Amino acid sequence: MSIARPIKVAIASFAHVHAAGYAKTLLEMPGVELLASDPDGASAPDASPRGAELAASIGLPYVDDYDQLFAWGPDAVIVTSENARHRAIVERAAAEGVHVLCEKPIATEVADAEAMVAACAAAGVILMIAYPVRFAPQFTALRQHLDAGALGDPFAIVGTNNGKIPIDSRQWFTDPLLAGGGAMVDHVVHCADLIDALTGGMRARTVYAAANGILHSEKNVAAETGGLVTITYESGLIATIDCSWSQPDAASTWGGLTLKVTGTNGSVEIEPFAEHVGGFGVEGDIRLDYGTDIDALLIDEFLDAVRRSGSAVEGQAPIVPQPDGAVGVRTLEIVDAARRSARVGAPVTL
């Protein structure tokens, strides 16, 4: 039965840099009640605020632990913890019958991701993965162009997803235990998701990756800060993804993403985060972004599915929006193969 009353959404953790943005988006949505908890925030060595302080700064109701968060009876939860802590929160949500939107990557290990998918399926709860670039109008146009056959058969894709190293605001991104790696884990998955959507979930066949720590070497981080990943898919399609933390710290924007698809009849390139007006000020470059709020579109898609699915029923499939947990597993398989390839210096077969 669908949900007609205001929907109750929990936010589990402020560890991820996207958490505050999701919260602000939700606060502006009608028919949504919010509650957040960030129990690990007080002990995190971050310069930016977390926990009750961050919640208060954006006007977000807050409780101190996940027991109180789930006792509130949420219909849905957005999991924005450190990557290695996703599984525990998602499995608890499944046990409580709470629909889940999980930040990317789904987990740090494929076995954990598969367990999360299985737990949500058994409990009848939604498991959606936070890949907002799928909702960019530029990607929609590219997908429609490809589906219409205008590019012919795609045989090569070049993706870039570069950004600033997030060490100042959230140090765990450079901790291999909590993040699962560095730049490859952080940035390969967005382009991998777009390719997954364009190919209808085609599996990767081989992955060859190279990574190093030349960028930001002065920061003494334990994870890779630069990487290049080459993927061969079942059809023979070849894709490369530059996933480096190569955006300068002083840049006026966090970074960006590009995707160029080449087929037998032509090629199209998109740059979803390019729209802005800019200039110069006394402190340097000025950049004012505009355009579609893809985070809002992602959350809209999730909440629409939650409303239409209603309360979870064990063993009964809900309305699952895309990208779902299966997409999360497939994209993590690519990241995992890239990590292994970079370690051994050779291609890895999936």
Describe the function of each predicted region:
Residues 5, 193-274, 299-311:
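Contiguous beta-strand/loop segments that form the cofactor/metal-binding neighborhood of enzyme cores
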Residues 133-220, 345:
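Predominantly a Rossmann-like dinucleotide-binding segment in NAD(P)-dependent oxidoreductases
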Residues 47, 57-119:
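Beta-loop-alpha module in the N-terminal Rossmann-like domain of NAD(P)-dependent dehydrogenases
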Residues 1-57:
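N-terminal Rossmann-like dinucleotide-binding module
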Residues 64, 102, 127-129, 270:
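Hydrophobic residues in well-ordered beta-strands that form the structural core
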Residues 115-133, 152-157:
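Rossmann-fold dehydrogenase core element
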Residues 1-3, 68, 76-78, 234, ...:
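C-terminal helix-rich "cap/oligomerization" subdomain common to oxidoreductases
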Residues 10, 29, 52, 60, ...:
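C-terminal glycine/acidic-rich active-site capping loop/insertion
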